[in-house]
Amino acid sequence: MDKSGSPNASRTSRRRRPRRGSRSASGADAGLRALTQQMLKLNKTLAIGRPTLNHPTFVGSESCKPGYTFTSITLKPPEIEKGSYFGRRLSLPDSVTDYDKKLVSRIQIRINPLPKFDSTVWVTVRKVPSSSDLSVAAISAMFGDGNSPVLVYQYAASGVQANNKLLYDLSEMRADIGDMRKYAVLVYSKDDNLEKDEIVLHVDVEHQRIPISRMLPT
């Protein structure tokens, strides 16, 4: 009796027939693992830029000090002629300055060049007398006295220079949030005119944590 026509034989034949365009399970698994690794890497990269109470990129990939957080403000220098200067006092939001006795540990400046940036700038942060009008002469003198660190930021073909952060440590000075109005960010355009849309300065002020309101605004 010919058993080739039996149902079992027919099912076996169908199971063994290769499907067109199919991939092996091991190949599909390897592709899925590679894609998963890429997604995890991308998510980790994106997470770096998300602000949190302990921002991972606050100071050279360090976290804020225990019990501290930070407030960021953004400065966009106007057009600065070659060899000239710009100064702007720090102005924190009212929601932060209401707690003016909270201590400030560090100030960090991060430079974000925009696509047309092709210049060299010097950037610093200084405690400035309230009587100072931040004139060109006054700012020039502060750059030259050596009393604060200066970040020299130059054009990089890649668009972002690796060294784009300046850290100013205030922990020994016992400075507080109320003192921040006495500090200013200063910029010197060394080699060329700096257009108003060439760089953005992100100023991070690390300070003791402040209470968070849990009431909705009226």
UniProtKB/Swiss-Prot annotation:
TM spans (from-to): none
One term of GO molecular function: structural molecule activity
Principal location: virion
Basic residues bias (residue ranges): 12-22
Protein name: Capsid protein
Family to which the UniProt record says this protein belongs: Belongs to the cucumovirus capsid protein family.
Protein's UniProt keywords contain Secreted: no
Keyword Metal-binding carried by entry: no
Organism of this sequence: Cucumber mosaic virus (strain Kin) (CMV)
Domain remarks in the Swiss-Prot or TrEMBL record: The N-terminal arginine-rich stretch does not seem to be the major RNA-binding region that allows formation of an infectious ribonucleoprotein complex.
GO cellular component: ribonucleoprotein complex; T=3 icosahedral viral capsid; viral nucleocapsid
Stretches the record annotates as Disordered: 1-30
Subcellular location as annotated: Virion
Entry-annotated residues carrying N-acetylmethionine: M1
Function of the protein: Capsid protein. Probably binds RNA and plays a role in packaging.
Lineage, uppermost ranks: Viruses, Riboviria, Orthornavirae, Kitrinoviricota, Alsuviricetes
Keyword terms, alphabetized: Acetylation, Capsid protein, Ribonucleoprotein, RNA-binding, T=3 icosahedral capsid protein, Viral nucleoprotein, Virion
